[in-house]
A protein has these predicted regions:
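Short, solvent-exposed loop/turn segments enriched in Ser/Thr/Gly
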Residues: 234-236
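A short beta-turn/strand-edge loop motif at beta-sheet boundaries
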Residues: 247-249
Length: 332
């Protein structure tokens, strides 16, 4: 003997989970069953369950064995994960998901496992301009009752970003280790590349070398607080960074213009060059001449060196230019 059943809406903790339908067939000492669930929380997800319930002679508690499989194809539109958990509101996700496992319940014990795979995954937080794209991998839970995954598992991703900072080709390793094969972000209308980096929980000391490619000189000088600047020209080079307990230090970085590529730079707000120096002195006159020259200067090449003074917690900048003032200088 057998029969069918269906539930239009299945609820749990005031959440409408979706519809359930299935069939039951009685056996000599139990019953076989099969059911499907169309998720309302995760649109497009379908869960199929097949199982058997048996009651042994002299026992009052049945034994249950079942196999389950979940499938969801990537959808055209991302979904708001706030439907799954209120704290996730504003996080949007997508991707193809498959999961399968088996479970056995016997009097006094419960065993269940799960293997879940995802491909083409994406999670974005539009309000914060952050996301992780193209992630894929498999996670195995040998024992679902403890929700602990098996060791040595990895999830790879194509790209992750926060604002203008982006990294590509990375993976999440066991123990919460975050590995980036390549990182990059746009700065001063150029590109800064980060080396392969492994970020580990509890570690607060890192040494990185940033490779800078064609940063615009004028906005660069402004952003590091050297002076207000206008004009063309780019610089490239390397900037070693030391991170110690959340503090950043620059260790002898240098940036230089490409050979044969000069430009014109106009600096404003250079009064600091002569600040505190008595007017009329030779030192004042030399610096005032340089200040006037930098108001508009045609350079053949430019070089910047940067270094942090640990004791003073200051970034020291040295600017070297080879060229000539665009206009004749006043007599000083």
């Amino acid at each position: 003997a057998g029969g069918r059943f269906s539930l239009t809406t299945l609820k749990w903790n005031d959440l409408s989970l979706g519809a359930v339908s299935g069939r039951v067939r009685q056996q000599a000492r139990g019953a076989d069953f099969a059911a499907t669930h169309q998720s309302a929380l995760l649109p497009g997800a379908r869960l199929a369950v097949d199982g058997h319930v048996a009651l042994a002679t002299g026992e009052t508690i049945p034994r249950v064995s079942l196999a389950y499989r979940l499938e969801r194809a990537a959808s055209r539109e991302d979904i708001d994960l706030g439907a799954l958990k209120a704290d996730w509101a504003g996080i949007r996700g997508n991707g193809r998901i498959t999961a399968a496992g088996r479970g056995v319940y016997e009097p006094g014990s419960l065993q269940a496992d799960l293997r879940m795979e995802i491909s083409g995954g994406r999670l974005t937080i539009p309000q914060k301009k952050a996301g992780i794209l193209g992630f894929e991998g498999a996670v195995v839970f040998p024992d679902l009752t403890t929700l602990r995954s098996a060791p040595r598992q990895q999830i790879a991703f194509e790209r992750t970003y926060v604002g203008d900072l982006a990294a590509s080709d990375g993976r999440i390793e066991p123990g919460g280790v975050f590995f980036l094969e390549q990182g990059r972000f746009q700065w001063c209308q150029g590109t800064v590349y980060l080396p392969a980096t492994r970020v580990m929980p509890g570690k607060d000391e890192y040494d990185l070398t940033l490779s800078c490619d064609r940063l615009k000189l004028a906005p660069l000088l402004e952003q590091i607080g050297a002076a207000r600047a206008e004009g063309g020209g780019t610089v490239s080079g390397r900037v070693p960074i030391r991170i110690r307990k959340g503090q950043f230090q620059v260790d002898s970085g240098f940036l230089y213009s490409s050979p044969g590529e000069g430009g014109t730079i106009r600096l404003r707000g250079t009064d600091m060059l002569t600040a505190g120096i008595p007017p009329g002195t030779p030192q004042f006159n030399q610096l005032e001449l340089a200040r006037q020259a930098l108001k508009e200067y045609d350079y053949d090449w430019v070089k910047l060196t940067l270094a942090t003074e640990p004791r003073e917690d200051l970034l020291r900048l040295k600017l070297q230019l080879s060229g000539r003032p665009t206009h004749p200088l006043p007599f000083i």
